Amino acid sequence: MKKILFAAAFILSAQFVLAQPNEKYIAAMKKNLETMDAASKDPASLLALANQFERIALAEKTQWLAYYYAAFCQVNTGFMQQDPSGMDVIADRASALINSADSLSPNNSEISCVKAMVATVRMLVNPMQRYMEFGPEIETNLEKAKVLDAANPRPYYLKGENLKNTPEQFGGGCATASAQLKTAKEKFDIFKPASQLHPNWGLQRVDKLLAECK
């Protein structure tokens, strides 16, 4: 009986150790995160960064943040596309990556935010034709993100930006976006990421959108 208990304890201990991020992983992630702002100005650089995060994810296998950032970089290249014909391919890749993150960290507010972003890229291929299909998916993921973590400012930011970019005749514009953006700003003011590797993006964009809505 003691041997069985010892073996079970050993297995649990080994699983715990394997789930912990190692120093090499942390250093690689921090290096990539430090280049994200610069890379975000150029689709090719952002795609290269997505590939770097994916390589980290494949090497580590148990760290959801590497898959998360790979998906985040990938989906943001979709928003930068001039030709909508390639946006579905980008969304497919981002979706696969964020689903891998979801399998490692289910019911995660940050992951739901990126899922909403992926659905937004799909909708932007042809908003008039695709809104009925992807609009509810965007909304569902953003509302889920709010429920999963009430302190997370990003679902409010993403909702506000979506509303700002929606024509007024369809219920959008600054008048409806401002409430979401102001809530996002309030939450950003007190938000503290769980670690230096956890998501902490969006504040600068919220400030810019609020300034545009004055």
What is the predicted function of each stretch?
Residues 172-179, 183-214:
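Terminal, low-structured helical/coil segments at or just beyond the last alpha-helical repeat
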Residues 88-138:
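Hydrophobic, well-structured mid-protein blocks that either form specific transmembrane helices
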